[in-house]
Amino acid sequence: MKIIYHDKNVHVFQSALFQTNSTVVETNDIILVVDPNWLPDEVGQIRHYTEGLVKASKKPVWLLFTHSDYDHIIGYNAFSDIAEGVIASRAFDENLGQEVILEQIKQFDDEYYITRPYLIDYPSVSYIVESERQVLEIGQTKLTFFNAEGHNPDGIFTIVNNVFIAGDYLCDVEFPYIYYSSWAYQNTLNKIEPLLEAFDIQLFISGHGNPTTDRDEVLRRRDEALEYIGNVRGSIRANKYFDFDKYMADKKFQFPRIMRRFHEGNLNIMRQEEFGH
């Protein structure tokens, strides 16, 4: 598993699968592990690194789940025995599709003959985020949360120590993947610029692809995401063809075969939003 970013307080691990990121943040008071994922050896590497921090610092481990997509919760039980707290949104905790999500993990493991040294479970949340700008203080550490619906219905943004943990928004390797609502997604994107300023963000970490320390890069990604949503919605309203191949070539995205499936999913959701069918 690659470490694609590190400084004295933050390590971002990236899986070989979908360039999915897991983040470990050490503050003055806690070790925060975010979305530990994919393959057993990769999850084990994150666990090993976390154990080293615990041994050296004696700080408690907290888990944070940005949203409930199965790839982001797949490593939960590799850490549940050492986690003092588990953070996620109210919608995450009350998700009625928990068994469906667990089945997705089991199907993935079956397909590739993967065995794990831990049981597959849906995270048991001990600290529930249920309001905009909710704050959790642990010692001197302050975590501030914002609702981030759109990609799915239960996402949250988290800001801690000038680090913006965004979940599956503004990933530089993909356009918006919309599983819930394009309008909610758009509203979530519009929150980002004010937060960059209000919290003096020094590091932005998306759920897939590359983190960035460049605010202009964050805003460029934001603008391109809004442009994609607007253009797709416009093509649907005008009953015009959206040239996906040209879009992929223009934006230099690398994975057209699978990304076409996600684009078609976006089209289906946005057609339902426009026409109700």
Task: Enumerate the language-model features and the residues they cover.
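Conserved beta-strand hairpin/beta-sheet module of binuclear metal-dependent hydrolase folds
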Residues: K2-G52, F157-C171
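Divalent metal-coordination and catalytic microenvironments
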Residues: N9, V25, D35, T50, ...
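Metallo-beta-lactamase
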Residues: I31, W38-L39, N147-E149, P153-R221
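Short catalytic-loop micro-motif centered on adjacent basic/acidic residues
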Residues: L32-D35, W62-L64, F145
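Active-site HxH/HxHxD metal-binding segment of metal-dependent hydrolases
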Residues: E42-G44, H48-R133, N231
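Glycine-rich phosphate-binding loop signature in dinucleotide/nucleotide-binding domains
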Residues: L53-K58, I138-G139, E197-F199
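Charge-patterned, long linear interaction tracts outside catalytic cores
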Residues: Q134-Q140, F145-D154
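Accessory terminal helices/loops
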Residues: P194-Q202, N210-H277
